[in-house]
Amino acid sequence: TALHNAGKLVKVFGGAVASDHVVTPQEPTVAQKITVHVSEKQRIAEYAAGLIGQGEFIYLDAGTTTGYMLEFFCDKDVTVVTNAVAHAQRLAKAGVKVRLVGGELKSSTEAVVGSEAMQTLRKYHFTKGFFGTNGVTKKAGFTTPDANEAMVKKTAIEQCQKKYVLCDHSKFGEVSSVTFLAFTGADVITDRITEGYQDCGNIVVIE
């Protein structure tokens, strides 16, 4: 719609919400994202990896921050399902049991998306899931520029017993085109508390 294109509405599953933030519909490539806020992402990733116990069945979303988790849990006896080709390759080389979902490969984020991926994910029941996001606000929730990727995230989240969204401080206040989860739908692991979010009970800040 005209309002959506103008950045006045944010698309969510089941409706739309008014936006007082600038919508950023562009999807940065993996090469662009991997050089930004590296130390923050590594600290977040190390903490998140520490939440994984032996014998767990986890979902690992595509993304640079989730990618940094790999070096911190490859010594654990776990099974990982992922829609990220790069994650799957690294896990397999490290000897971790890994399952890569099938579907359409999205070139910019190197993530597998589409109905085939969603159909596969509905068969699984994960103990924990770790997800990336392009933006987060209380009103719009967790957002991403691509509707297909949002649907895969949403499907995987529904199959997780515990859900964690990994995002550095720069993602707060940002809104991308499509909401895949309400703000209160997961625990957030970040490196710095943002003004206006100090009283949120679902945020873990890594010093």
Where in this protein do the model-derived segments appear?
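Alpha-helix C-terminal capping segments
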Residues: I52, M69, F73-C74, L91, ...
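Glycine-rich N-terminal segment of FAD-binding domains in flavoprotein oxidoreductases
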Residues: G63-T64
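HTH-adjacent hinge/linker in prokaryotic transcriptional regulators
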Residues: T1-Y59, L70, T79, A92-V96
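Conserved phosphate- and dinucleotide-binding cores of soluble alpha/beta proteins
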Residues: K11, A86-E207
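A glycine- and small-aliphatic-rich helix-loop capping segment at beta-alpha/alpha-beta transitions
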Residues: C74-T79, N148
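Short, contiguous clusters of charged residues that form electrostatic/catalytic patches at enzyme active sites
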Residues: S39-E46, G50, G67, S115, ...
